């Protein structure tokens, strides 16, 4: 894990990092480690998106519910002698920039949020002045053709 992060950090402009791991091998745990490493590098805002809402619920439990047996962090989380909190947010405008702020959504939900702006929701403007990390599980679904799009082409 440290080798991967060291290689990643040595790039001039790291743009993407992919972990190809089998089901049940600890991808979510690796993702939690990456979030903590990126926090130390100054990143505070994360968008976690997947193709299905039940994966979101499992991930929320792993990241936010300290009473869950699958919770991935210590009960008290400290980085550089500073206590921080992992919070679910709807946008980054009012988020505490000392905490780890995560928007959990589906791919479809992210598209909808960005293209149908609502008050206190995530917008394209959030990307203009903030460092935001995009995290995805089940990445093989991200570039896949939709059924609707495939039917149109056929």
Report residues per predicted region.
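RecA-like P-loop NTPase motor core of helicase/translocase proteins
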Residues: 1-154
